[in-house]
Amino acid sequence: MSIIEDARHGIVTEEMKQVAKAEGVTEDFIRRSVAEGHIVIPVSPYRKVKICGIGEGLRTKVNASIGTSTDIVNIPEEIEKAKQAERAGADTLMELSTGGDFADIRRQIIANTTLSVGSVPLYQAFIEAVKKDGAVIHMKEDDLFRITAEQAKLGTNFMAIHTGINWETVKRLRNQGRHAGLVSRGGAFMTAWMLHNEKENPLYSEFDYLMEIMKEHEVTLSMGNGMRAGAIHDATDRAGIQELLINAELADKAHAKGIQVIVEGPGHVPIDEIATNVQLMKRVTNNKPFYMLGPIVTDIAPGYDDRVSAIGAAISSSLGADFICYVTPAEHLALPTPEEVYEGVISSRIAAHVGDMVKLKKVREADLEMGHARRDLDWERQFAVAMNPARARKIREERMPADTDGCTMCGDFCAIKIVNRYFKF
Protein backbone atom coordinates (compact mmCIF):
# COMPACT_ATOMS: atom_id res chain seq x y z
CA MET A 1 0.00 0.00 0.00
CA SER A 2 1.04 3.61 -0.56
CA ILE A 3 1.48 5.97 2.36
CA ILE A 4 -1.93 7.52 1.58
CA GLU A 5 -3.57 4.11 1.61
CA ASP A 6 -1.90 3.31 4.94
CA ALA A 7 -3.29 6.57 6.33
CA ARG A 8 -6.78 5.78 5.04
CA HIS A 9 -6.66 2.41 6.80
CA GLY A 10 -5.74 4.07 10.10
CA ILE A 11 -2.08 3.05 9.98
CA VAL A 12 0.44 5.53 11.39
CA THR A 13 3.67 4.83 9.52
CA GLU A 14 7.17 5.51 10.79
CA GLU A 15 7.38 8.48 8.42
CA MET A 16 4.22 9.97 9.92
CA LYS A 17 5.63 9.54 13.42
CA GLN A 18 8.83 11.34 12.42
CA VAL A 19 6.93 14.27 10.91
CA ALA A 20 4.67 14.54 13.97
CA LYS A 21 7.68 14.66 16.28
CA ALA A 22 9.56 17.19 14.16
CA GLU A 23 6.55 19.49 13.85
CA GLY A 24 5.21 19.18 17.40
CA VAL A 25 1.79 17.88 16.34
CA THR A 26 -0.08 14.64 17.00
CA GLU A 27 0.48 11.52 14.96
CA ASP A 28 -3.22 11.29 14.24
CA PHE A 29 -3.25 14.82 12.82
CA ILE A 30 -0.53 13.80 10.38
CA ARG A 31 -2.29 10.55 9.49
CA ARG A 32 -5.62 12.27 8.81
CA SER A 33 -3.99 15.06 6.82
CA VAL A 34 -2.05 12.61 4.65
CA ALA A 35 -5.24 10.61 4.04
CA GLU A 36 -7.09 13.79 3.04
CA GLY A 37 -4.27 14.99 0.79
CA HIS A 38 -3.54 18.10 2.86
CA ILE A 39 -0.03 16.89 3.75
CA VAL A 40 2.50 14.94 1.70
CA ILE A 41 5.57 13.08 2.94
CA PRO A 42 7.85 12.41 -0.07
CA VAL A 43 9.28 8.90 0.18
CA SER A 44 10.87 6.33 -2.13
CA PRO A 45 11.21 2.55 -1.94
CA TYR A 46 14.70 2.92 -3.41
CA ARG A 47 16.46 5.14 -0.83
CA LYS A 48 16.17 6.41 2.72
CA VAL A 49 15.89 10.17 3.12
CA LYS A 50 15.53 12.80 5.80
CA ILE A 51 11.77 12.71 6.27
CA CYS A 52 9.97 15.95 5.50
CA GLY A 53 6.27 16.76 5.76
CA ILE A 54 4.80 19.43 3.49
CA GLY A 55 1.34 20.90 3.94
CA GLU A 56 -1.27 22.47 6.18
CA GLY A 57 -0.36 22.99 9.82
CA LEU A 58 3.35 22.36 9.24
CA ARG A 59 6.37 24.61 8.96
CA THR A 60 6.79 26.11 5.47
CA LYS A 61 9.39 24.07 3.60
CA VAL A 62 12.13 25.34 1.28
CA ASN A 63 13.31 23.68 -1.92
CA ALA A 64 16.67 24.37 -3.58
CA SER A 65 16.98 23.68 -7.31
CA ILE A 66 20.37 22.76 -8.73
CA GLY A 67 21.63 21.20 -11.96
CA THR A 68 23.86 21.64 -14.99
CA SER A 69 23.18 23.64 -18.14
CA THR A 70 24.28 23.19 -21.74
CA ASP A 71 27.04 25.74 -21.09
CA ILE A 72 28.30 24.47 -17.73
CA VAL A 73 28.53 20.77 -16.91
CA ASN A 74 30.54 20.47 -13.70
CA ILE A 75 29.35 17.53 -11.62
CA PRO A 76 31.65 18.16 -8.61
CA GLU A 77 30.28 21.69 -8.42
CA GLU A 78 26.69 20.43 -8.56
CA ILE A 79 27.48 18.00 -5.74
CA GLU A 80 28.89 20.92 -3.77
CA LYS A 81 25.70 22.89 -4.45
CA ALA A 82 23.67 20.00 -3.03
CA LYS A 83 25.87 19.98 0.06
CA GLN A 84 25.67 23.75 0.48
CA ALA A 85 21.89 23.67 0.15
CA GLU A 86 21.66 21.02 2.84
CA ARG A 87 24.08 22.91 5.12
CA ALA A 88 22.01 26.06 4.70
CA GLY A 89 18.89 24.22 5.82
CA ALA A 90 17.00 23.37 2.62
CA ASP A 91 14.25 20.80 3.14
CA THR A 92 14.35 19.33 -0.38
CA LEU A 93 16.40 19.47 -3.58
CA MET A 94 15.36 19.50 -7.21
CA GLU A 95 17.94 18.20 -9.69
CA LEU A 96 17.20 19.98 -12.98
CA SER A 97 20.20 19.28 -15.19
CA THR A 98 19.95 20.02 -18.91
CA GLY A 99 23.53 19.14 -19.86
CA GLY A 100 25.73 16.06 -19.48
CA ASP A 101 24.86 12.47 -18.60
CA PHE A 102 21.51 12.91 -16.84
CA ALA A 103 21.39 9.53 -15.10
CA ASP A 104 24.97 9.80 -13.84
CA ILE A 105 24.46 13.35 -12.55
CA ARG A 106 21.24 12.45 -10.75
CA ARG A 107 22.76 9.28 -9.31
CA GLN A 108 25.71 11.25 -7.89
CA ILE A 109 23.51 14.00 -6.46
CA ILE A 110 21.24 11.44 -4.78
CA ALA A 111 24.30 9.68 -3.33
CA ASN A 112 25.53 12.94 -1.80
CA THR A 113 22.43 14.20 -0.01
CA THR A 114 20.04 12.97 2.66
CA LEU A 115 17.26 15.23 1.37
CA SER A 116 14.27 14.27 -0.75
CA VAL A 117 15.15 14.89 -4.40
CA GLY A 118 12.79 16.03 -7.13
CA SER A 119 13.14 16.12 -10.91
CA VAL A 120 11.41 17.14 -14.15
CA PRO A 121 11.46 14.10 -16.49
CA LEU A 122 10.25 16.26 -19.38
CA TYR A 123 13.62 18.03 -19.54
CA GLN A 124 15.55 14.84 -20.14
CA ALA A 125 13.03 13.53 -22.67
CA PHE A 126 13.14 16.67 -24.79
CA ILE A 127 16.91 17.16 -24.55
CA GLU A 128 17.54 13.54 -25.55
CA ALA A 129 15.30 14.20 -28.57
CA VAL A 130 17.49 17.17 -29.48
CA LYS A 131 20.64 15.04 -29.22
CA LYS A 132 19.16 12.17 -31.20
CA ASP A 133 16.91 13.86 -33.77
CA GLY A 134 17.87 17.53 -33.69
CA ALA A 135 14.87 19.23 -32.03
CA VAL A 136 12.47 19.00 -29.09
CA ILE A 137 9.57 18.54 -31.50
CA HIS A 138 10.84 15.03 -32.27
CA MET A 139 10.40 13.76 -28.70
CA LYS A 140 8.76 10.31 -28.63
CA GLU A 141 5.92 9.80 -26.18
CA ASP A 142 7.22 6.38 -25.15
CA ASP A 143 10.59 7.92 -24.30
CA LEU A 144 8.92 10.42 -21.97
CA PHE A 145 7.24 7.68 -19.93
CA ARG A 146 10.34 5.46 -20.01
CA ILE A 147 12.48 8.30 -18.63
CA THR A 148 9.89 9.04 -15.94
CA ALA A 149 10.07 5.43 -14.73
CA GLU A 150 13.88 5.38 -14.91
CA GLN A 151 14.17 8.53 -12.80
CA ALA A 152 11.77 7.05 -10.26
CA LYS A 153 13.93 3.93 -9.97
CA LEU A 154 16.97 6.08 -9.18
CA GLY A 155 15.24 7.13 -5.96
CA THR A 156 13.59 10.37 -7.04
CA ASN A 157 11.04 11.34 -4.37
CA PHE A 158 8.89 13.84 -6.23
CA MET A 159 8.49 14.92 -9.84
CA ALA A 160 7.21 18.09 -11.46
CA ILE A 161 4.95 16.86 -14.25
CA HIS A 162 3.47 19.33 -16.75
CA THR A 163 0.01 17.82 -17.01
CA GLY A 164 -1.96 21.06 -17.13
CA ILE A 165 -0.81 22.10 -20.60
CA ASN A 166 -3.44 20.95 -23.09
CA TRP A 167 -5.19 22.42 -26.13
CA GLU A 168 -7.47 24.54 -23.95
CA THR A 169 -4.49 26.05 -22.13
CA VAL A 170 -2.57 26.73 -25.34
CA LYS A 171 -5.66 28.27 -26.96
CA ARG A 172 -6.05 30.71 -24.07
CA LEU A 173 -2.37 31.61 -24.20
CA ARG A 174 -2.60 32.26 -27.94
CA ASN A 175 -5.86 34.25 -27.72
CA GLN A 176 -4.68 36.41 -24.86
CA GLY A 177 -1.01 37.04 -25.63
CA ARG A 178 1.66 37.95 -23.10
CA HIS A 179 4.26 40.58 -22.34
CA ALA A 180 7.05 38.10 -21.57
CA GLY A 181 5.89 34.94 -23.31
CA LEU A 182 6.62 31.53 -21.77
CA VAL A 183 9.51 31.18 -19.32
CA SER A 184 8.97 27.62 -18.12
CA ARG A 185 11.30 25.32 -20.05
CA GLY A 186 8.88 22.44 -19.66
CA GLY A 187 5.97 24.64 -20.73
CA ALA A 188 7.82 25.98 -23.76
CA PHE A 189 9.04 22.53 -24.83
CA MET A 190 5.62 20.93 -24.53
CA THR A 191 3.77 23.78 -26.23
CA ALA A 192 6.17 23.68 -29.19
CA TRP A 193 5.84 19.88 -29.39
CA MET A 194 2.04 20.06 -29.39
CA LEU A 195 1.82 22.79 -32.02
CA HIS A 196 4.32 21.14 -34.37
CA ASN A 197 2.91 17.63 -34.08
CA GLU A 198 -0.73 18.73 -33.76
CA LYS A 199 -1.12 16.31 -30.87
CA GLU A 200 -2.36 16.55 -27.30
CA ASN A 201 0.15 16.66 -24.45
CA PRO A 202 0.75 12.97 -23.63
CA LEU A 203 1.08 13.78 -19.92
CA TYR A 204 -2.53 14.94 -20.09
CA SER A 205 -3.96 12.43 -22.57
CA GLU A 206 -2.17 9.47 -20.94
CA PHE A 207 -2.56 10.63 -17.36
CA ASP A 208 -3.86 7.22 -16.27
CA TYR A 209 -0.63 5.60 -17.46
CA LEU A 210 1.41 8.31 -15.74
CA MET A 211 -0.44 7.56 -12.50
CA GLU A 212 0.51 3.89 -12.78
CA ILE A 213 4.19 4.88 -12.83
CA MET A 214 3.80 7.29 -9.92
CA LYS A 215 1.90 4.71 -7.87
CA GLU A 216 4.26 1.83 -8.60
CA HIS A 217 7.35 3.78 -7.52
CA GLU A 218 5.67 5.81 -4.70
CA VAL A 219 6.63 9.12 -6.31
CA THR A 220 4.96 12.30 -5.06
CA LEU A 221 3.38 14.09 -8.01
CA SER A 222 4.07 17.82 -8.22
CA MET A 223 1.64 19.34 -10.72
CA GLY A 224 3.97 21.49 -12.83
CA ASN A 225 3.25 25.10 -13.70
CA GLY A 226 4.28 25.35 -17.35
CA MET A 227 2.17 28.46 -17.99
CA ARG A 228 3.49 30.46 -15.06
CA ALA A 229 4.12 34.14 -15.70
CA GLY A 230 7.69 35.28 -16.31
CA ALA A 231 6.86 38.91 -15.60
CA ILE A 232 4.58 40.48 -13.04
CA HIS A 233 2.45 42.03 -15.82
CA ASP A 234 1.52 38.51 -16.95
CA ALA A 235 0.52 37.31 -13.48
CA THR A 236 -2.89 35.78 -12.78
CA ASP A 237 -3.83 35.57 -16.46
CA ARG A 238 -6.21 33.23 -18.27
CA ALA A 239 -3.59 30.73 -19.43
CA GLY A 240 -2.21 30.35 -15.91
CA ILE A 241 -5.65 29.94 -14.36
CA GLN A 242 -6.72 27.46 -17.05
CA GLU A 243 -3.67 25.33 -16.27
CA LEU A 244 -4.46 25.53 -12.56
CA LEU A 245 -8.01 24.28 -13.11
CA ILE A 246 -6.78 21.30 -15.14
CA ASN A 247 -4.08 20.52 -12.58
CA ALA A 248 -6.62 20.73 -9.76
CA GLU A 249 -8.90 18.18 -11.45
CA LEU A 250 -6.03 15.80 -12.19
CA ALA A 251 -4.68 16.24 -8.65
CA ASP A 252 -7.99 15.00 -7.25
CA LYS A 253 -7.86 12.03 -9.62
CA ALA A 254 -4.32 11.12 -8.53
CA HIS A 255 -5.16 11.50 -4.85
CA ALA A 256 -8.14 9.17 -5.27
CA LYS A 257 -5.69 6.58 -6.68
CA GLY A 258 -3.47 6.83 -3.59
CA ILE A 259 -0.81 9.13 -5.05
CA GLN A 260 0.55 12.03 -3.01
CA VAL A 261 0.12 15.37 -4.79
CA ILE A 262 1.59 18.88 -4.59
CA VAL A 263 0.27 21.70 -6.80
CA GLU A 264 2.73 24.27 -8.12
CA GLY A 265 1.92 27.96 -8.22
CA PRO A 266 3.24 31.00 -10.07
CA GLY A 267 6.70 32.57 -10.10
CA HIS A 268 6.21 36.31 -10.82
CA VAL A 269 3.37 37.97 -8.90
CA PRO A 270 2.95 41.58 -7.70
CA ILE A 271 2.34 41.86 -3.98
CA ASP A 272 -1.30 42.90 -4.37
CA GLU A 273 -2.10 39.67 -6.27
CA ILE A 274 -0.40 37.17 -3.95
CA ALA A 275 -3.43 36.70 -1.69
CA THR A 276 -5.68 36.10 -4.71
CA ASN A 277 -3.32 33.44 -6.04
CA VAL A 278 -2.90 31.60 -2.75
CA GLN A 279 -6.61 31.65 -1.91
CA LEU A 280 -7.64 30.56 -5.41
CA MET A 281 -5.14 27.72 -5.51
CA LYS A 282 -6.01 26.42 -2.08
CA ARG A 283 -9.72 26.58 -2.88
CA VAL A 284 -9.75 24.87 -6.28
CA THR A 285 -7.23 22.17 -5.27
CA ASN A 286 -9.16 21.20 -2.12
CA ASN A 287 -6.34 22.43 0.10
CA LYS A 288 -3.56 20.32 -1.35
CA PRO A 289 0.00 21.35 -0.50
CA PHE A 290 0.79 24.51 -2.46
CA TYR A 291 4.28 25.02 -3.90
CA MET A 292 5.03 28.69 -4.64
CA LEU A 293 7.94 29.39 -7.00
CA GLY A 294 9.17 32.43 -5.10
CA PRO A 295 7.39 34.51 -6.10
CA ILE A 296 9.35 37.37 -7.62
CA VAL A 297 7.46 40.59 -6.79
CA THR A 298 9.34 43.04 -9.03
CA ASP A 299 11.22 42.43 -12.26
CA ILE A 300 13.81 45.23 -12.03
CA ALA A 301 16.26 43.90 -9.43
CA PRO A 302 18.49 41.30 -11.17
CA GLY A 303 21.38 40.38 -8.91
CA TYR A 304 19.11 40.71 -5.87
CA ASP A 305 16.32 38.33 -6.81
CA ASP A 306 16.91 36.20 -3.72
CA ARG A 307 15.73 39.21 -1.68
CA VAL A 308 12.93 40.05 -4.10
CA SER A 309 11.71 36.46 -3.89
CA ALA A 310 11.97 36.43 -0.10
CA ILE A 311 9.50 39.31 0.07
CA GLY A 312 6.97 37.38 -1.99
CA ALA A 313 7.66 34.09 -0.26
CA ALA A 314 7.13 35.57 3.20
CA ILE A 315 3.74 36.93 2.18
CA SER A 316 2.79 33.70 0.40
CA SER A 317 3.76 31.61 3.39
CA SER A 318 1.80 33.81 5.78
CA LEU A 319 -1.29 33.35 3.60
CA GLY A 320 -1.04 29.57 3.42
CA ALA A 321 1.61 28.52 0.88
CA ASP A 322 3.20 25.32 2.18
CA PHE A 323 6.35 24.97 0.09
CA ILE A 324 8.54 27.59 -1.57
CA CYS A 325 11.24 27.26 -4.17
CA TYR A 326 14.29 29.33 -3.40
CA VAL A 327 15.71 31.93 -5.76
CA THR A 328 19.42 32.78 -5.88
CA PRO A 329 21.11 36.14 -6.56
CA ALA A 330 22.02 34.72 -10.00
CA GLU A 331 18.39 34.22 -11.09
CA HIS A 332 17.73 35.59 -14.61
CA LEU A 333 21.49 36.10 -15.07
CA ALA A 334 23.51 32.88 -14.82
CA LEU A 335 23.81 29.39 -13.38
CA PRO A 336 24.33 29.90 -9.64
CA THR A 337 27.53 29.11 -7.78
CA PRO A 338 27.55 26.97 -4.61
CA GLU A 339 27.87 30.17 -2.58
CA GLU A 340 24.82 31.67 -4.29
CA VAL A 341 22.88 28.47 -3.63
CA TYR A 342 23.69 28.83 0.07
CA GLU A 343 22.60 32.49 0.08
CA GLY A 344 19.39 31.63 -1.76
CA VAL A 345 18.45 28.98 0.79
CA ILE A 346 19.10 31.31 3.72
CA SER A 347 16.97 34.06 2.14
CA SER A 348 14.11 31.61 1.57
CA ARG A 349 14.39 30.16 5.07
CA ILE A 350 14.08 33.66 6.50
CA ALA A 351 10.99 34.21 4.34
CA ALA A 352 9.48 30.88 5.41
CA HIS A 353 10.06 31.72 9.08
CA VAL A 354 8.48 35.15 8.69
CA GLY A 355 5.42 33.56 7.09
CA ASP A 356 5.24 30.87 9.73
CA MET A 357 5.19 33.55 12.44
CA VAL A 358 1.71 34.41 11.15
CA LYS A 359 0.21 30.96 10.60
CA LEU A 360 2.13 29.01 13.29
CA LYS A 361 2.42 31.24 16.34
CA LYS A 362 4.72 28.77 18.12
CA VAL A 363 7.62 29.61 15.80
CA ARG A 364 7.76 33.07 17.41
CA GLU A 365 9.39 31.45 20.43
CA ALA A 366 12.77 31.67 18.69
CA ASP A 367 12.31 35.41 18.18
CA LEU A 368 11.34 35.77 21.85
CA GLU A 369 14.51 33.95 22.86
CA MET A 370 16.57 36.26 20.65
CA GLY A 371 14.95 39.28 22.28
CA HIS A 372 15.89 38.00 25.73
CA ALA A 373 19.44 37.19 24.61
CA ARG A 374 19.89 40.71 23.27
CA ARG A 375 18.44 42.22 26.45
CA ASP A 376 20.97 40.21 28.47
CA LEU A 377 23.84 40.97 26.04
CA ASP A 378 24.32 37.21 25.82
CA TRP A 379 26.19 36.87 22.54
CA GLU A 380 26.52 33.09 22.59
CA ARG A 381 22.75 32.70 22.96
CA GLN A 382 22.24 35.16 20.11
CA PHE A 383 24.51 33.13 17.85
CA ALA A 384 22.77 29.89 18.82
CA VAL A 385 19.33 31.25 17.91
CA ALA A 386 20.46 32.99 14.71
CA MET A 387 19.39 31.62 11.32
CA ASN A 388 23.06 31.64 10.23
CA PRO A 389 25.20 31.49 13.39
CA ALA A 390 28.51 31.41 11.53
CA ARG A 391 27.83 34.64 9.66
CA ALA A 392 26.60 36.46 12.76
CA ARG A 393 29.68 35.39 14.71
CA LYS A 394 32.04 36.34 11.87
CA ILE A 395 30.65 39.87 11.53
CA ARG A 396 30.91 40.51 15.27
CA GLU A 397 34.39 39.05 15.67
CA GLU A 398 35.75 41.07 12.74
CA ARG A 399 34.62 44.28 14.50
CA MET A 400 34.93 43.42 18.18
CA PRO A 401 34.44 46.44 20.50
CA ALA A 402 36.73 47.42 23.35
CA ASP A 403 33.87 46.69 25.76
CA THR A 404 32.96 43.14 24.76
CA ASP A 405 29.49 43.35 26.32
CA GLY A 406 28.30 45.70 23.58
CA CYS A 407 29.04 46.13 19.88
CA THR A 408 30.69 48.73 17.65
CA MET A 409 27.33 50.08 16.47
CA CYS A 410 26.67 51.96 19.72
CA GLY A 411 30.00 51.64 21.52
CA ASP A 412 29.91 53.48 24.86
CA PHE A 413 26.30 54.54 24.26
CA CYS A 414 24.66 51.12 24.33
CA ALA A 415 20.96 51.69 25.02
CA ILE A 416 20.54 48.27 26.59
CA LYS A 417 23.41 48.75 29.05
CA ILE A 418 22.16 52.19 30.05
CA VAL A 419 18.58 51.06 30.75
CA ASN A 420 19.69 47.83 32.44
CA ARG A 421 21.22 49.93 35.23
CA TYR A 422 17.74 51.07 36.23
CA PHE A 423 15.34 48.33 35.12
CA LYS A 424 15.22 44.59 35.51
CA PHE A 425 13.10 43.31 32.63
Curated annotation (Swiss-Prot):
It catalyses: 5-amino-1-(5-phospho-beta-D-ribosyl)imidazole + S-adenosyl-L-methionine = 4-amino-2-methyl-5-(phosphooxymethyl)pyrimidine + CO + 5'-deoxyadenosine + formate + L-methionine + 3 H(+). Its cofactor is [4Fe-4S] cluster. Pfam families: ThiC_Rad_SAM. Transmembrane segments: none annotated. [4Fe-4S] cluster binds at C407, C410, C414. It comes from the Archaea. One of its GO terms (molecular function) is 4 iron, 4 sulfur cluster binding. Pathway: Cofactor biosynthesis; thiamine diphosphate biosynthesis. InterPro entries: ThiC, ThiC/Bza_core_dom, ThiC/BzaA/B. Its EC number is 4.1.99.17. One of its GO terms (biological process) is thiamine diphosphate biosynthetic process. Keywords: 4Fe-4S, Iron, Iron-sulfur, Lyase, Metal-binding, S-adenosyl-L-methionine, Thiamine biosynthesis, Zinc. Binds 1 [4Fe-4S] cluster per subunit. The cluster is coordinated with 3 cysteines and an exchangeable S-adenosyl-L-methionine. Substrate binds at M94, Y123, H162, S184, R185, G186, N225, G226, M227, R228, E264, Y291. HAMAP family: ThiC. NCBIfam families: PRK13352.1, thiC. This is Phosphomethylpyrimidine synthase. It comes from Methanoregula boonei (strain DSM 21154 / JCM 14090 / 6A8).
